[in-house]
């Protein structure tokens, strides 16, 4: 951990060194090309000194030139406005978390209120999913093209003794080469015993395009370490004390927890390179044909580790060790993809690709039990082949993509088809089908732990999880935003309690049918606004394996105005979140996974926030009073069984853009 801390400090020092150096050039100056002829003699000076001409300050380039490019080459521009959507994204994840319920401390996990089954992987993915909410994947890294250096600082206060800062810097070294460097760090002690969080996400990315435009390169390096102290939740007596609303327990540190000697860390590094080359020069706009060859390299090395000084045998069962328990799971994943893409104005775009993946998942030793032998590794090679098609025609867009494993120990395929239509400037409609078959996550197939009950090998017994869905989406600022998805899952893999009361992996042969409808509308009345988002969910079959709240809603009433001769923009109002009661998933710290429980119903507690936000130039300032109603409402709010939700808290922060 000392090495991680040292590396983190060095990276922060490097970043701020890069940040400070360009500050000397904030005022760009332009001198006359004929300086000698335009100098002016100062006749009042006995030394006949030469006074330089008055220097001109360059105007900042238009905001439209500051471009953000996704890995899929979708381009947006830097947005410094203060909207209600910006308020929703002002959180630790930097994205709208309407479908999630956070735990009490910043940087802990989230319980999922609204589910998403749109995954397109054809091979297993790493477990410890409860720790991956802030783990940045390939699609979370963006690339930039900016006319002048750009810096963004994000800050938000946390829950006692710490801070959350996300610092970002990008610049173009030339018209065709850009790099960016960023670091997001968090430390928060929390209000309850032993829930400190300490996380870091370092990103470095660059993109390049050759002078003739035929070669394009995107690449990034990401290093992430996400550490959480674990306490197992409140004890039974502490839960009673919490619900009693006794003032002596308003200091949450007085509430006893199940243990105070455990911590877990998710650590990962990734190297990513995405490059393509045009075989046919695009010098003539009449040229309708384009052939590109490309290569994508993605190497990731990650591990999850759970450490505990004294095993909590009363909660997790007997242990092979009596002290200093350490469970570590590693994954090395090395993927190479080569593709050929043909584009034609009449026919559309057709892509063929071949993937090779080397994977090595597991542990250092084999476990021999009375019930059998549990191996230490899942290791091998996978080869997959696929194709995709895309065509635009008079407002319509057709897209299709298919991929299947053709060699290796894991079978799997993915098929996605979508049609969309842009109705002038009124609305965008899309609909499609998605079919996927892939192995369950690695920690369902193989898991080893010092806790005797947390050892299993299911790779030979589990079938592929098969998911099929029909989706519809409409986006319209004039009407409303709406989406609907009907999902059917067979051979669904999940975690739940076994007959002995310990968490284990299960796979059901029953169908799980899930319907989700989500609607959003932002209505304006002069300077007032009302933004409503409602999600409806139901599980028509398989309700014992997938529990969801029937209704999740967020309603925000707000007022906006310009003050002080339009030098200050103000946004103030209240935000109301609510979800119906249901059998909420419970959290297991050993696995860092949520598991199904059907005994305790949680929900139907409102969450009311008050906010007063401001924008001055390129700075957005936020003042948020979170969960105000907890001051007068009963203590019946939980993020998971045994884990209370946040109490009333005042939060402050800002997002500041510098255009240097």
Predicted regions and their residues:
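Membrane-proximal, glycine/serine-rich, low-complexity loop/turn segments characteristic
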Residues: 26-266, 280-288, 420-426, 642-648, ...
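Terminal non-domain segments
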Residues: 8-13, 255, 313-314
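Solvent-exposed loop segments that connect transmembrane elements
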Residues: 235, 243-247, 317, 370-375
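Exposed beta-strand and adjacent loop surfaces of beta-rich binding modules
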Residues: 22, 178, 349
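A solvent-exposed, charged loop/short amphipathic helix patch at secondary-structure junctions
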Residues: 313-325
């Amino acid at each position: 951990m000392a090495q991680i801390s040292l590396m983190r400090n060095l990276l922060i020092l490097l970043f701020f060194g890069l940040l400070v150096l360009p500050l000397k050039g904030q005022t760009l100056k332009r001198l006359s090309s004929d300086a000698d002829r335009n100098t002016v003699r100062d006749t009042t000076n006995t030394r006949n000194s030469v006074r330089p001409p008055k220097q001109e300050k360059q105007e900042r380039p238009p905001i439209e030139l500051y471009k953000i490019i996704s890995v899929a080459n979708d381009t947006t521009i830097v947005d410094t406005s203060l909207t209600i959507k910006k308020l929703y994204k002002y959180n630790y994840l930097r994205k709208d978390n309407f479908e999630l319920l956070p735990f009490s401390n910043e940087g802990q996990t989230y319980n999922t209120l609204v589910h998403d089954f749109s995954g397109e992987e054809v091979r297993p993915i790493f477990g410890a999913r409860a720790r991956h909410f802030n783990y940045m994947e390939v699609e979370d890294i963006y690339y930039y093209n900016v006319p002048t250096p750009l810096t963004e600082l994000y800050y938000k206060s946390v829950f006692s003794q710490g801070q959350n800062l996300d610092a970002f810097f990008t610049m173009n070294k030339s018209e065709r080469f850009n790099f960016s460097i960023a670091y997001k760090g968090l430390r928060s002690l929390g209000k309850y015993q032993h829930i400190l969080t300490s996380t870091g996400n370092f990103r470095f990315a660059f993109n390049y395009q050759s002078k003739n435009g035929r070669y394009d390169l995107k690449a990034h390096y990401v290093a992430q370490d996400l550490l959480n102290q674990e306490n197992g939740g409140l004890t039974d007596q502490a839960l009673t004390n919490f619900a009693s609303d006794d003032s002596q327990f308003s200091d949450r540190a007085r509430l006893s927890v199940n243990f105070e000697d455990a911590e877990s860390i998710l650590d990962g590094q990734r190297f990513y390179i995405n490059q393509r080359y045009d075989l046919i020069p695009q010098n003539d706009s009449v040229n309708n044909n384009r052939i590109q060859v490309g290569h994508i390299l993605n190497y990731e090395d990650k591990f999850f580790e759970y450490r505990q000084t004294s095993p909590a045998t009363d909660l997790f069962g007997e242990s092979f060790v009596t002290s200093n328990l350490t469970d570590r799971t590693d994954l090395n994943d090395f993927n190479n993809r080569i593709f050929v893409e043909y584009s034609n104005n009449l026919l559309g775009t057709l892509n063929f690709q071949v993937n090779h993946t080397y994977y090595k998942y597991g542990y250092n030793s084999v476990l021999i039990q009375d019930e059998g032998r549990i191996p230490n590794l899942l290791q091998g090679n996978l080869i997959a082949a696929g194709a995709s098609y895309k065509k635009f025609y008079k407002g319509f867009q057709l897209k299709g993509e298919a991929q299947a494993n053709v060699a290796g120990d894991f079978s799997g395929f993915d098929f996605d088809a979508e049609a969309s239509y842009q109705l002038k400037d009124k609305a965008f409609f899309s609909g499609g089908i998605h079919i996927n078959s892939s192995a369950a996550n690695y920690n369902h197939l193989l898991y080893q732990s010092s806790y005797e009950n947390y050892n299993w090998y299911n790779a030979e017994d589990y079938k592929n999880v098969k998911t099929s869905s029909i989706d519809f989406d409409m986006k319209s600022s004039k009407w409303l935003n709406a989406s609907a998805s009907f999902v059917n899952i067979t051979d669904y893999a999940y975690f739940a309690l076994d007959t002995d009361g310990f968490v284990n992996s299960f796979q059901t042969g029953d169908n799980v049918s899930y319907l989700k409808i989500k609607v959003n509308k932002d209505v304006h009345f002069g300077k007032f606004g009302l933004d409503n988002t409602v999600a409806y969910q139901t599980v028509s079959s398989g309700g014992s394996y997938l529990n969801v709240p029937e209704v999740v809603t967020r309603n925000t009433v707000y007022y906006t105005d310009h003050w002080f001769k339009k030098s200050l923009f103000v946004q103030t109002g209240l935000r109301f979140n609510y979800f119906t009661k249901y059998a909420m998933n419970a959290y297991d710290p050993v696995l860092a996974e949520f598991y199904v429980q059907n005994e305790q119903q949680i929900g139907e507690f409102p969450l009311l926030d008050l906010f007063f936000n401001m924008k001055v130039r390129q700075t957005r300032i936020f003042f948020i009073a979170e969960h105000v109603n907890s001051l007068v409402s009963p203590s019946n709010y939980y993020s998971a069984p045994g884990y209370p939700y946040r109490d009333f808290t005042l939060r402050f922060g800002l997002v500041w853009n510098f255009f240097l």
